[in-house]
Curated annotation (Swiss-Prot):
<dbReference type="GO" id="GO:0001953">
    <property type="term" value="P:negative regulation of cell-matrix adhesion"/>
</dbReference>
<dbReference type="GO" id="GO:1903165">
    <property type="term" value="P:response to polycyclic arene"/>
</dbReference>
<feature type="disulfide bond">
    <location>
        <begin position="566"/>
        <end position="691"/>
    </location>
</feature>
<feature type="disulfide bond">
    <location>
        <begin position="102"/>
        <end position="119"/>
    </location>
</feature>
<keyword id="KW-0145">Chemotaxis</keyword>
<dbReference type="InterPro" id="IPR001604">
    <property type="entry name" value="Endo_G_ENPP1-like_dom"/>
</dbReference>
<feature type="glycosylation site" description="N-linked (GlcNAc...) asparagine">
    <location>
        <position position="398"/>
    </location>
</feature>
<dbReference type="GO" id="GO:0048714">
    <property type="term" value="P:positive regulation of oligodendrocyte differentiation"/>
</dbReference>
<dbReference type="GO" id="GO:0005509">
    <property type="term" value="F:calcium ion binding"/>
</dbReference>
<dbReference type="GO" id="GO:0060326">
    <property type="term" value="P:cell chemotaxis"/>
</dbReference>
<feature type="region of interest" description="Disordered">
    <location>
        <begin position="586"/>
        <end position="615"/>
    </location>
</feature>
<feature type="disulfide bond">
    <location>
        <begin position="148"/>
        <end position="194"/>
    </location>
</feature>
<feature type="region of interest" description="Phosphodiesterase">
    <location>
        <begin position="144"/>
        <end position="501"/>
    </location>
</feature>
<feature type="region of interest" description="Required for secretion">
    <location>
        <begin position="854"/>
        <end position="875"/>
    </location>
</feature>
<dbReference type="GO" id="GO:0044849">
    <property type="term" value="P:estrous cycle"/>
</dbReference>
<keyword id="KW-0479">Metal-binding</keyword>
<feature type="binding site">
    <location>
        <position position="474"/>
    </location>
    <ligand>
        <name>1-(9Z-octadecenoyl)-sn-glycero-3-phosphate</name>
    </ligand>
</feature>
């Protein structure tokens, strides 16, 4: 089982136990475990048993699906976890006599109930044959030797209401292991080549087992379901959760609704999802096959198999060790036993199988360890969750001297070869979704791949020899390629011989619900984004309804009404050009504008614009106008080079969209337009920013959402300096934003044959990953009502086929998105004192994001007008550009 830097050859933990009011549980058991140098848990091994009672018998009860409560003894697959098995459980339920396979000499044997499985003539009717019985004794072929076949409809025996689902989960299966192919893993390779597969599946952060297994089960991020690590402390409970502690059995730690509970609540039977480690893999497979043979009214519809390998070997030998071949062969052999067993039951064209991992594995050793004692003088005053990531809290909750910001400062950019980066949790990249939970410590260390972090050397080298007992680990940033894992779907409901783009594991819960005909519980996935995996779709997503329609300004205010402290119009030469520039701002119109709200038609100090209505070209809104999904008031402002949705509440655009061709030129800003800001005569002075606020607030400056550098003409450049294109920016952040607009946008347009860019502000002061309400915004430009964003976003869309220009694309789209933290310093980049070309693009890659993340943080909905199907658009929205090399 996954653990923080596990060492040595010891029995691993299989899975946590969690009992809920319905009679299904998920379970972890601990054999007596050797204390490991990198183990997060307490040094003493606690008893995991709420009660112990061995009276009674397992005769006729082996692996019963109903969990028996205390004080009776148990015979289910998790009784070992609770030390509550009946006294004869091992004798009756864990038989191993004569092994797990038929041989020629066993065919037609006299039934012996002591055998692990049977090769007798009656074994098929009794459902307890060895999985290779038909092959050895009846001359049939192994499943793996049969040709791929397209299963267009489920071929199930009578009585099966729906195709059963078997989830075959493997711990620590790095995606690149699949490159070993059929020579090492012929059965898994056949599942991949004949079914649906992705190059990899992205785990959630942290890339540890507990968080990811429970994410697979619930579709929730760790910050949402509460299992934020393999170990954690809850300050409200004043309790700690560890692999071997009794707390893991307490339901209060586990949030959300896992799949087996969803199934039970909707009348669908679920088999066990987790297994005690003492139960051999072969017995687990045989038990699942026996459950599939139960009468219709007893047979579950969903099952799960869990393997502790190849994680255990990956930790011990590293992902590249030659010793990894045998564990992978053993996993493949188990897959073959399952598929042969299904074929033997005539269920191989009926059952859907998902082969899935929880995370990958990286090459890590003790020699690559950063010690906080080299940075801090008080490491004995802190508690560090160590290893491939670091979580820091005060050792004593009463330590009044503990100051997270001081610790962050003492850990930031102190060495040129530093291998970790400290963050306050709210400043972590938004794509990690790792802040909004009290169990996540305030200080977080993102550790470089292949490295560890510890408090001091004594925490690692506890033995006099100082020998390192591990060669691999996981837990790193979930976009790192070595952390990616495997996904394969095979069966009648999955597509045949289909490769799909990578996706995140939060999406699988919805797919599994679709396979079982269930309505998913609320989760972080985007239902419908993986419809392309399935042959037929039971769920068809629909576009959300727009909540707030925009205003279309139909008048303009007189120049004399504005006293915003802006210094630009007096620089316009000749003077009569000012009125001409303002006339450029008239509403260009469209069918939407004709039927929309035109604000204000009467005012003694206002004059109507040219009344003609021109057909609006979609040059800058290639995929339709973003919809606002909450109640507010905003205006659509048209310009030659860009369009904006201007918020009357925030006094800045919610979004600004523009399209840049491959041939676009970057122009300089004339000296007389430096520090230029113009009033926008279409927007009331009361709904405009006041430039004087920036003169009063010495800590704040401003920038523009549409870059003046990319204006198409000298006249259009004046549009870019409108106050309605202005947003508050810290001077340090302006360096990032200016380089992005001046250099990177042009670079992306050149590389991709043109791009559409949508940018805007984000407000997430409570760091819950959702749009803040007005009441939740905490910071304003001094002396004003101008709110200060916590982040800025940018969505860059082009044609996937770069031979097609962005504005003429008739095929799939490509997207790169960013959520850039808006902070008063650039300390995240240790070389920020250098030229922006040395660090800004790397900073942006760190803060890459999904469009879906941006939608949650802004309350906007993008890509609403396109010829692509909505499911295809959802797939685009959930895509993350990782900037990693190929797996």
């Amino acid at each position: 089982m996954a653990r923080q830097g596990c060492l040595g050859s010891f029995q691993v933990i299989s899975l946590f136990t969690f009992a809920i009011s319905v009679n299904i549980c998920l379970g972890f058991t601990a054999s007596r475990i050797k204390r490991a140098e990198w183990d997060e848990g307490p040094p003493t091994v606690l008893s995991d048993s709420p009660w112990t009672n061995t009276s009674g018998s397992c005769k006729g009860r082996c692996f019963e699906l109903q969990e028996v409560g205390p004080p009776d003894c148990r015979c289910d697959n998790l009784c070992k976890s609770y030390s509550s098995c009946c006294h004869d459980f091992d004798e009756l339920c864990l038989k191993t006599a004569r092994g797990w396979e038929c041989t020629k000499d066993r065919c037609g044997e006299v039934r012996n109930e002591e055998n692990a499985c049977h090769c007798s003539e009656d074994c098929l009717s009794r459902g307890d044959c060895c999985t290779n019985y038909q092959v050895v004794c009846k001359g049939e072929s192994h499943w793996v030797d049969d040709d791929c076949e397209e299963i267009k409809v489920p071929e199930c025996p009578a009585g099966f209401v729906r195709p059963p689902l078997i989830i075959f989960s493997v711990d620590g299966f790095r995606a690149s292991y699949m490159k070993k192919g059929s020579k090492v893993m012929p059965n898994i390779e056949k599942l991949r080549s004949c079914g649906t597969h992705a190059p990899y599946m992205r785990p959630v952060y942290p890339t540890k087992t507990f968080p990811n297994l429970y994410t697979l089960a619930t579709g929730l991020y760790p910050e949402s379901h509460g299992i934020v690590g393999n170990s954690m402390y809850d300050p409200v409970f004043d309790a700690s959760f560890h692999l071997r502690g009794r707390e893991k059995f307490n339901h209060r730690w586990w949030g959300g609704q896992p799949l087996w509970i969803t199934a039970t609540k909707q009348g669908v039977r679920a088999g066990t999802f987790f297994w005690s480690v003492s139960i051999p893999h072969e017995r687990r497979i045989l038990t699942i096959l026996q459950w599939l043979s139960l009468p219709d009214n007893e047979r579950p519809s969903v099952y799960a198999f869990y393997s502790e390998q190849p994680d255990f070997s990956g930790h011990k030998y590293g992902p590249f060790g030659p010793e990894m071949t045998n564990p992978l062969r053993e996993i493949d052999k188990t897959v073959g036993q399952l598929m042969d067993g299904l074929k033997q039951l005539r269920l191989h064209r009926c059952v859907n199988v998902i082969f899935v991992g929880d995370h990958g594995m990286e090459d890590v050793t003790c020699d690559r360890t950063e010690f906080l004692s080299n940075y801090l003088t008080n490491v004995d005053d802190i508690t560090l969750v160590p290893g491939t990531l670091g979580r820091i809290r005060a050792k004593s909750i009463n330590n009044s001297k503990y100051d997270p910001k001081t610790i962050i400062a003492n850990l930031t950019c102190k060495k040129p070869d530093q291998h970790f980066k400290p963050y306050m949790k709210q400043h972590l990249p938004k794509r990690l979704h790792y802040a909004n939970n009290r169990r996540i410590e305030d200080i977080h260390l993102l550790v470089d791949r292949r490295w560890h972090v510890a408090r001091k050397p004594l925490d690692v080298y506890k033995k006099p020899s100082g020998k390192c007992f591990f060669q691999g680990d996981h837990g790193f940033d979930n976009k790192v390629n070595s952390m990616q894992t495997v996904f394969v779907g095979y069966g009648p409901t999955f597509k045949y011989r289909t490769k799909v783009p990578p996706f995140e594991n939060i999406e699988l819960y919805n797919v599994m619900c679709d396979l079982l005909g269930l309505k998913p519980a609320p989760n972080n996935g985007t239902h419908g984004s993986l419809n392309h995996l399935l042959r037929t779709n039971t769920f068809r997503p629909t576009m959300p309804d727009e909540v707030s329609r925009p205003n279309y300004p139909g008048i303009m205010y007189l120049q004399s009404e504005f006293d915003l402290g802006c210094t630009c119009d007096d620089k316009v030469e000749p003077k009569n050009k000012l009125e001409e520039l303002n006339k450029r701002l008239h509403t260009k119109g469209s069918t939407e504008a004709e039927t929309g709200k035109f604000r204000g038609s009467k005012h003694e100090n206002k004059k109507n614009l040219n009344g003609s209505v021109e057909p609006r070209k979609e040059r800058h809104l290639l995929y339709g106008r973003p919809a606002v999904l909450y109640r507010t008031s905003y205006d659509i402002l048209y310009h030659t080079d860009f369009e904006s949705g201007y918020s009357e509440i925030f006094l800045m655009p919610l979004w600004t969209s523009y399209t840049i061709s491959k041939q676009a030129e970057v122009s300089s800003i004339p000296e007389h337009l430096t520090n230029c800001v113009r009033p926008d005569v279409r927007v009331s002075p009361g709904f405009s920013q006041n430039c004087l606020a920036y003169k009063n607030d010495k800590q704040m400056s401003y920038g523009f959402l549409f870059p003046p550098y990319l204006s198409s003409s000298p006249e259009a450049k004046y549009d870019a300096f409108l106050v309605t294109n202005m947003v508050p920016m810290y001077p340090a952040f302006k360096r990032v934003w200016a380089y992005f607009q001046r250099v990177l946008v042009k670079k992306y347009a050149s590389e991709r044959n043109g791009v559409n860019v949508i940018s805007g502000p984000i407000f997430d002061y409570n760091y819950d990953g959702l749009r803040d309400t007005e009441d939740e915004i905490k910071q304003y430009v001094e002396g004003s009502s101008i709110p200060v964003p916590t982040h800025y976003y940018s969505i860059i869309t082009s044609c996937l086929d770069f031979t097609q220009p962005a504005d003429k694309c008739d095929g799939p789209l490509s997207v790169s998105s960013f959520i850039l933290p808006h902070r008063p310093d650039n300390d995240e980049s240790c070389n920020s004192s250098e030229d922006e070309s040395k660090w800004v693009e790397e900073l942006m890659k760190m803060h890459t994001a999904r469009v879906r993340d941006i939608e949650h943080l802004t309350g906007l909905d993008f890509y609403r007008k396109t010829s692509r199907s909505y499911s295809e658009i959802l797939t685009l929205k959930t895509y993350l550009h990782t900037y990693e090399s190929e797996i």
